[in-house]
């Protein structure tokens, strides 16, 4: 993380470093305000980057702002289409936003697109848990 901070210090317009640090904090659920600010800065440089938009959506998810998370993550999925992690993020947000049917559809799509056994296992567990609720 220190190396990312240094990269940003040396080049404040390094959108990849801004997003990387912001997403890392979002994934950890820490420093969410600063994470959002870093990702917003990255998006000013590359406004249509689906991965950066996913990062912003994930910050909103971690903050518990599920409607905004869904809005950003739907946009991220439109821009990246095949990324199973972004699709899983959208499914997670749908579930928290009280839209379990949409969550299930997206979880199933993420399983089809994923090539990582750990991710597939995790998502299948989410599907099973959600199917029991519905």
Question: What does each of the following model-derived ranges do?
Answer:
Residues 15-24:
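Amphipathic alpha-helical repeat scaffolds of TPR domains
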Residues 1-6, 28-41, 63-75, 98-109:
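Structural signature of tandem alpha-helical TPR/SEL1-like repeats
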Residues 17, 52, 86, 120-123:
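TPR alpha-solenoid repeat register
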Residues 27-28, 62, 96, 126-133:
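Register position in tetratricopeptide repeats
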Residues 20, 55, 89, 123-126:
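Canonical tetratricopeptide repeat
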